[in-house]
Amino acid sequence: MAKESYKRDKPHVNIGTIGHVDHGKTTLTAAITSVLAKQGLALQRDFGSIDKAPEERERGITISTAHVEYQTKKRHYAHIDCPGHADYIKNMITGAAQMDGAILVVAGTDGPMPQTREHILLARQVNVPALVVFLNKVDIADPELLELVELELRELLTEYNFPGDDIPIIKGSALKALDGDPEGEKAIMELMDAVDEFIPEPVRDVDKPFLMPVEDVFSISGRGTVGTGRIERGRIKINEEVEIVGIKPTRKSVVTGIEMFQKLLDEGQAGDNAGLLLRGVDKTELERGMVIAKPGSIKPHTKFKAEVYILRKEEGGRHTPFFNGYRPQFYFRTTDVTGSVTLPEGVEMVMPGDNLSVEVELIVPIAMDEGLRFAIREGGRTVGAGSVTKIIE
């Protein structure tokens, strides 16, 4: 079947749902598509098709990151349903990194829970610019409790440097909206209005040199290897030369095809989730953690100085200090790389809650510029965050 070309007649915004497990993120995602489908602005996606992660399906826990597409009158949205379960923070970090804004889903019956806090913190760490809150399950929650939940949420958002007093909190029931209840549907439209208004149209990095972090790799028989990911900056056209940078020695290739949402494009640009077909590249030569970039625009490095913040125990961080030579994983863009930490002279140890400058040496090179952000992780758990301040080699 010939793929239809993708139209660009509205601003494109990447958003997603975040929040505690079982608070209704996936139900809300399904409800948004169902309500907008009635206005011809979306294809309806049922809960099961969004929640497709077979090994965990029985327990009703969403693991994989589902991509859904819909429109409002003003915008075109690519929506990610982020996993809520603590074990899947790894996916959350790649997912949240793809957001221009997020809908924080909180059950009115529970109020903020540990993962609510964790996701707000992660949103702050990966620089999600704006949040809108959907207070779910209000049909079965105690009205007096809802007022307290709202106050608590605003305080929590403020604590992590989001504008807690100004963030819209929309009350509703995703399940009722999904069942076609008029009150339920009205809340979804209110939510989409709030998302249109409050989540700023992203300032795209289209004028910078092209760069796309590789999230996944496929091979198409007879055509070659496809790298998928979200284009971080710049534009890419068919037949342009690119470099594949990081982990292994840098190599050149040519982009022979670009597709987005299963539709072919002649050009991809910053903000697009795209698949790039690469000439002469074997599936084994491309892996998650590499970047595809404009030749000469970015170099791989192993040693750098960074400003880091080490999470407090209460934020889900370490319970104990670490010392010179500490070897955690550094999560850059889409992958973890082990590295060793050298503390500044005169610093014996680092306590949870500390903020300091360190030197890091990675075991494999990663494409980096100054200002690149990363998470510091141990066995899949985020224990800190940082930003590259100076490249050494």
Swiss-Prot record:
GO CC entries: cytosol
Chief location: cytoplasm
UniProt keyword annotation of Metal-binding present: yes
Record-linked InterPro entries: EF-Tu_GTP-bd (IPR041709), EF-Tu_GTPase (IPR050055), EFTu-like_2 (IPR004161), EFTU_2 (IPR033720), G_TR_CS (IPR031157), P-loop_NTPase (IPR027417), Small_GTP-bd (IPR005225), T_Tr_GTP-bd_dom (IPR000795)
Compartments, record wording: Cytoplasm
Region (G3): 81-84
Annotated residues for binding of Mg(2+): 26
Positions of region (G5): 173-175
Enzyme class, spelled out: hydrolase
Binding residues annotated for GTP, in chain numbering: 19-26, 81-85, 136-139
Catalysed reactions listed for this entry: GTP + H2O = GDP + phosphate + H(+)
Every tr-type G domain range: 10-203
A Pfam family it matches: GTP_EFTU_D3
UniProt EC number: 3.6.5.3
Region called G2, residue ranges: 60-64
Keywords attached to this entry: Cytoplasm, Elongation factor, GTP-binding, Hydrolase, Magnesium, Metal-binding, Nucleotide-binding, Protein biosynthesis
Annotated spans, G4: 136-139
Function: GTP hydrolase that promotes the GTP-dependent binding of aminoacyl-tRNA to the A-site of ribosomes during protein biosynthesis.
Family per similarity comment: Belongs to the TRAFAC class translation factor GTPase superfamily. Classic translation factor GTPase family. EF-Tu/EF-1A subfamily.
Record protein name field: Elongation factor Tu
